[in-house]
Amino acid sequence: MDKIINNLNLMSEEELLDPSISAEKLLNGHRAYYYDLFDPPFYILSRYDDIDKALRDPETFLEGYGNGPNFINSNGIVSDGDHHTFIRRIVQPNFLMGSIKNLERRLEEITDDLLDDINNKEEWDIHDDLSFPLPVIIICEILGIPTDDIKRFKGWADAAVAQMCSEEPETFQKELDKMDDYFLTLINKKRSMPEDDSLISRIANSKINNEYLSDDEAVRLLAQIFVAGNETTTSLISNLVWRLLSIDNLWNDFVADKLQIDGLISESLRFDPPLLGLFKTTSKDVTYDDVTIPTNTKVMMHYGAANRDSEIFDNPNKFDSTRDGKKVISFSVGIHICLGRELAKLETRVALRALKKRFPNLKLINNGQRVGPFLFWGRSKLPVSHN
């Protein structure tokens, strides 16, 4: 067992290109694995039941020190206890099912506009031309942010996720300071105006004990929603198109209405989770068999491994869109379950429907390029062609 697990290297070229290799090693090893190839070192949970239980125990597994491997004093939605509950109530109305359904027509319009731009191209890129701009535009509209410079916004989001996974997070701070300054300017502008229906206006004007959120927390909350609102969905769309085009006959079966789109989305989330895992921090010692994780230690909840746990999923290394997806854990569970999960699914549904209708002969040119940070799993490039 130890021989299998001792060569785990989440940042190796092999495991970055195929995270299922890491998942298999973890699932064949200890329930709690000590990973010392990162500074600071951390533990990894990989079993589905262990992760599910940990995510439902927010008093033991804390969010407030950041959900990456580095220790930070976090706030906004990445927080704990009553404060997290209050912050979540500020943003939740925009992500309830009723609000999400009202966005479907607008999503269809954005998607059609994006695909119109590439209609006459023989070759184009799923990421650059569709899966990146679609979620960025819609999250900007939800927040009330101008959409005139989405490439700059995408650069900020990329810097944020890179910082989250880096042993040298300070190298990304200069770029992120620009994002913070931009958001703070918008927040101050909204505070000087009557409150409107935008989410940024609600964030700017919300109060705790009759005081506005601090500038830092308002900016962090806005940044968290902005980054989460596009990174996950971008990879979900790209990953699913990639699998549909790379697995024999899967795209043709989809075009022929032999596969249900919701089943495909659920299975893509299981098989290719856009986030391979997030981190918690222990508030007390926690023991798994003969391994004790000390207090104040970072623990990675490895969603990618949990989604391939054979105790939960039959034949887990096979992409099967007919399986029951209710236990897929990619959006987390418990009080920190992803607020934008239904929006991400709807965006993917709209994108896939449009591709199927307009480009039934879609072909993969090559496998493109993987996103960089080890916690994330998606395509930063995915070139395709159509006749």
Give the ranges of each region predicted by the language model.
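Cytochrome P450
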Residues: 1-387
